[in-house]
Amino acid sequence: MKTTLSILAAAALLVGCESVSNRTLGTTAGGAIIGAGIGTMAGGDDRRNAAIGAVVGGLAGAAVGVYMDKQEEKLRQQTAGTGIEVDRVGDQIALSMPSGLTFDVNSAAIKGDFYGPLNDVSSTLIEYPQTAVDVVGHASSDGDDAYNQDLSERRASSVQTYLINSGVQSVRLRAIGMGETQPIADNSTQAGRAANRRVEILLTPIVEEGA
């Protein structure tokens, strides 16, 4: 069964540049956020998935795994040698962008060195449109909680905007700020804080209703 919402209804349900504040998510061994928690954020968001499906269509049955396999392979090829980590759990993919590529301390401006890898990622997202894309921003423990939450949201929004400007459909994208709540390294060291200043991109397949 195809998704039944019209494009106009989709626009009403989801205005492209949606932002989400800090929530609890799972993590991979490498530190990228994925797993049971992301089901609530992405795969379990029926209204959002219906809105995206109305625009790009949905996947059915065995096609889901094959589609994500091909997308994962392309992403690994595109990001080889960049330091971007690609993780896979079930039918979801997570990209973790290293701190050296992404943002300086206290900044939400994308570093110039990040443009090339981000362009490669955006080209793959355009080639494989039947996924919801959550852009998740993180901060180190420098500063207070409220400041870091705001900073992480602005970082996620910066990447979201860049992807939209690169041609990724805005209806697919959502920016999420996690503040300092999901560290992958020790915040007591300079190297650890640098590692915690990062952005992750989470991909969840859009599945047809009843599939």
Question: Which residues does each PLM region occupy?
Answer:
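Periplasmic peptidoglycan-binding/anchoring modules of Gram-negative envelope and division proteins
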Residues: Q78, T102, N106-G137, I164, ...
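Sec-dependent signal peptide recognition
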Residues: M1-A10
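Extracytoplasmic
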Residues: K70, G81, R88-Q92, S96-P98, ...
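C-terminal motif of bacterial Sec signal peptides marking the signal peptidase cleavage site
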Residues: L13-G16
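Stable alpha-helical elements in mature extracytoplasmic
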Residues: I34, Q71, L75, F114-P117, ...
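Short, low-complexity, glycine-enriched hydrophobic/amphipathic alpha-helices that associate
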Residues: E18-K74
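Soluble periplasmic/extracytoplasmic beta-strand elements of cell-envelope proteins
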Residues: E85-D87, Q92-T102, A132-V136, Y162, ...
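Periplasmic OmpA-like peptidoglycan-binding domain that tethers envelope proteins to the cell wall
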Residues: H138-E208
